[in-house]
Amino acid sequence: MSSIDLKSKFLKVYDTLKSELINDPAFEFDDDSRQWIEKMLDYNVPGGKLNRGLSVVDSYQLLKGGELSDDEIFLSSALGWCIEWLQAYFLVLDDIMDESHTRRGQPCWFRLPKVGMIAANDGILLRNHVPRILKKHFRGKPYYVDLVDLFNEVEFQTASGQMIDLITTLVGEKDLSKYSLSIHRRIVQYKTAYYSFYLPVACALLMFGEDLDKHVEVKNVLVEMGTYFQVQDDYLDCFGAPEVIGKIGTDIEDFKCSWLVVKALELANEEQKKVLHENYGKKDPASVAKVKEVYHTLNLQAVFEDYEATSYKKLITSIENHPSKAVQAVLKSFLGKIYKRQK
């Protein structure tokens, strides 16, 4: 099946799930609440690239090694949408915490005049939709308990990663010397890699009847891939074109533990370090420009390109060491989607 067919079938599943959620018998909806949920879902869930969600279907298809039945397409898509729902929940709350302005090329949900802090409760609802979907469509499956457990564990890891990110960037305690590659890696591993990379493949493996405890090596490769993905994200936040990436980067203003600042501190001379310490994390454009100037002087674009090439080689080697050709195909498909991406 072509990727276009797959995407249109995937999007149809969203409509089905949304319809089930706004008619969930566990709550007495009226027109107002139904309309609110529908608008909130349409605004926050399907707007991204859908890579995480579609990856469940792709991965399952590669594991199966043949055409999928309508039921398999529906179930793998439903799991994919659970990840997109989880992602929407993280992003809605993340944008409030970061005081962001845009997301996916439109104003953040909480920035809409009628929404504001209602967005906090919407985030909780998005999170609660996941077990509703799992219960409705997977309760009779032998892997149901493992699925619920997987989503709970990954959510815990992601929230804990977000916590390290937030407490490392505490306002009033801006101390760049706390930042290092190892802290960056910990934040990335927990905040991004588990839910964006491991979760889609783990869902496909469970649906295929596999035991996740036997696939620790797959998890390790995917966490490495997630780290590489986040370094790309950090790079694009500063060097990407806002009209391409869909948002205006604010990592410098937000005092983020970005790969760029960690690398810059590693390579800078004393004078450049002083500029970084004095200007990183300040909102005014002049300070941001000074930080970017140091990045350019240190030629961080070339440093990143070197990192990208090395990471790619290492990942390919790890993938090709895996005994299963089907699993190799899943991992290579993932890597192919993100290698040298521009957004």
UniProtKB/Swiss-Prot annotation:
Deleted gene: phenotype: Reduced growth and lower artemisinin levels.
Localization (cell): Cytoplasm; Nucleus
Keyword annotations: Cholesterol biosynthesis, Cholesterol metabolism, Cytoplasm, Isoprene biosynthesis, Lipid biosynthesis, Lipid metabolism, Magnesium, Metal-binding, Nucleus, Steroid biosynthesis, Steroid metabolism, Sterol biosynthesis, Sterol metabolism, Transferase
InterPro entries (UniProt xref): FPS1-like, Isoprenoid_synthase_dom_sf, Polyprenyl_synt, Polyprenyl_synt_CS
Any single Gene Ontology cellular-component annotation: cytoplasm
Cofactor(s) for this UniProt protein: Mg(2+)
Binding site for Mg(2+) 2: D94, D98
Binding-site residues, isopentenyl diphosphate: K49, R52, Q87, R104
Annotated catalysed reactions: isopentenyl diphosphate + dimethylallyl diphosphate = (2E)-geranyl diphosphate + diphosphate; isopentenyl diphosphate + (2E)-geranyl diphosphate = (2E,6E)-farnesyl diphosphate + diphosphate
A single MF term (Gene Ontology): (2E,6E)-farnesyl diphosphate synthase activity
Use in biotechnology or industry: Artemisinin and derivatives (e.g. artesunate), are antimalarial drugs due to their endoperoxidase properties; they also display multiple pharmacological actions against inflammation,viral infections, and cell and tumor proliferation. Artesunate may be a promising treatment for COVID-19 mediated by the severe acute respiratory syndrome coronavirus 2 (2019-nCoV) (SARS-CoV-2) because of its anti-inflammatory activity, NF-kappaB (nuclear factor kappa B)-coronavirus effect and chloroquine-like endocytosis inhibition mechanism.
UniProt EC number: 2.5.1.10, 2.5.1.1
Cofactor-binding details, from the entry: Binds 2 Mg(2+) ions per subunit.
Any single Pfam family the record assigns to this protein: polyprenyl_synt
Protein name in UniProt: Farnesyl pyrophosphate synthase
Species of provenance: Artemisia annua (Sweet wormwood)
Lineage summary: Eukaryota, Viridiplantae, Streptophyta, Embryophyta, Tracheophyta
Gene name as annotated: FPS1
